[in-house]
């Protein structure tokens, strides 16, 4: 019953990671050894930032996906955090279907993420 389950559930990834679209790697994540520091730094930034919540949520989402801290579920977790950040600012955002929007425009989403890595 446990066959195929990820061994790293509940902790940061221990190996390399990346984002793949089809057969194309669009992002290689930072080394696993750097993940705890990077995640801590990201949450410290979120705690202390004066950026507008719309900007902060987007920066957080992008940086979280860039770090790619887990072996699986990074996209869902990043979008969940973005929704949380926005809904703490304006409760209406609790009902924003970010998952559906990303799924509908997944090709464009990955293209935009890939483009930002080139800048």
For every predicted segment, state its role.
Residues 1-119:
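FIC/Doc superfamily catalytic core
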